[in-house]
Amino acid sequence: MLLLDKINELKKIVAESSSIVFFGGAGVSTESNIPDFRSENGLYKTKNNFSYPPEVMLSHTFFKNHTEDFFEFYREKMIFKDAKPNAAHYSLAKIEEQGKLKAIVTQNIDGLHQLAGSKNVYELHGSIHRNYCMDCGKSFDLEYVIKSETTIPKCDKCGGIVKPDVVLYEEGLDDSIIQNSVKAISEADTLIVGGTSLVVYPAAGLIRYFKGNKLILINKSATAYDNEADLVISDSIGKVLETVI
């Protein structure tokens, strides 16, 4: 099937759907100049000036034992303060506005879906925009972490370490986020999966809960679920979704 035919098929599916859920990964934000993890230009493949590989530095153990190094890496490689939503984010917000898109389940931590206007967003891996004191629980915004005078941001109330509300390796996902995501996916008539290679578990396993009619995959590279999908589009997610609205 030609790309144009696939896009027309996608338009038809969206038009006939009343309960769509979008499940997205890092590829959704690469068009906002936020690197993904596993592609050739991704965080895990590109050179950096740190002594440890990124997947080690993004672990709970590393955060606990090398807190200063963690924050140096986190500020430099995980925060993209000036990133703006792209065509994919805005298109999804529009489909939600039309009443068709019921939820976005995202593996991203950048908050760009909300910035584009999406309301019902489940952030599996947390958000850079939420930070909290590990001792007293006080909440802080991203600006507080960025502008901290010390490498390790400290609570202005009790002096405890302010930790980003992002899920590190070795940490579990939030139960309520998982439950809401499972509920949304299991009740959807159409599931659009975009910008993810579906290799990160337990997040990727959520697709198993889909019982609806149409599974659509939009990703530049192949995924393990391609054979199970009703429609596979190997192209830019922003370009594809923009044609639907």
Curated annotation (Swiss-Prot):
Q: Which residues bind nicotinamide?
A: F37, I109, D110
Q: Which GO terms describe its molecular function?
A: histone deacetylase activity, NAD-dependent; NAD+ binding; zinc ion binding
Active-site residues, record numbering mapped to chain: H125 (proton acceptor)
Record's SUPFAM superfamilies? DHS-like NAD/FAD-binding domain
Free-text comment on the cofactor = Binds 1 zinc ion per subunit.
Which annotated residues bind NAD(+)? Answer: A26, T30, F37, R38, Q107, I109, D110, H125, T196, S197, N219, I237
Specify whether Cytoplasm is a keyword of the entry: yes
- What Enzyme Commission number(s) does the record list for this chain? 2.3.1.286
- Its EC top class is transferase
Keyword Cell wall biogenesis/degradation in record: no
Pinpoint the Deacetylase sirtuin-type domain residues: 1-245
- Which InterPro entries does the entry link to? DHS-like_NAD/FAD-binding_dom (IPR029035), NAD-dep_sirtuin_deacylases (IPR050134), Sirtuin (IPR003000), Sirtuin_cat_small_dom_sf (IPR026591), Sirtuin_class_U (IPR028628), Ssirtuin_cat_dom (IPR026590)
Entry-linked HAMAP family: Sirtuin_ClassU (MF_01968)
- Family to which the UniProt record says this protein belongs: Belongs to the sirtuin family. Class U subfamily.
Q: What does this protein do?
A: NAD-dependent protein deacetylase which modulates the activities of several enzymes which are inactive in their acetylated form.
The name this protein goes by in its record: NAD-dependent protein deacetylase
Specify the species: Clostridium acetobutylicum (strain ATCC 824 / DSM 792 / JCM 1419 / IAM 19013 / LMG 5710 / NBRC 13948 / NRRL B-527 / VKM B-1787 / 2291 / W)
